[in-house]
Amino acid sequence: LNGGAIPGTIENLKDAAAGENGEWTKMYAEFAKVAKEEGFDRIAYLFEAVAKIEKEHEERYRKLIENIENGTVFEKDGEVYWICQNCGHIHKGKTPPKICPVCAHPQGYFQVRAENYK
């Protein structure tokens, strides 16, 4: 795999996105087609549902690539709440701190806080 070399993050994300694309456009589509032909409608439905999930994965990877290439992983246009995934420290700003002031973990531990529980 990769001649023993470890690819960079963007290359890994591109490979992952391509893999997800093949899964939702070819693999699960073909599985669903065969299941329908064989009269397994429920199984065909499940394969189609999984294909939609794989499509979402591809889109997520492509958005991550875009964020890395545009330098927006840790920089947003407006102020947002960032949460440290190690200790839970919350920081409000366009960027998270370089080092968490509570647990001293690096910036890579921060992500934009989701508020899907409200």
Language model: regions and residue ranges:
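Non-heme di-metal
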Residues: 1-118
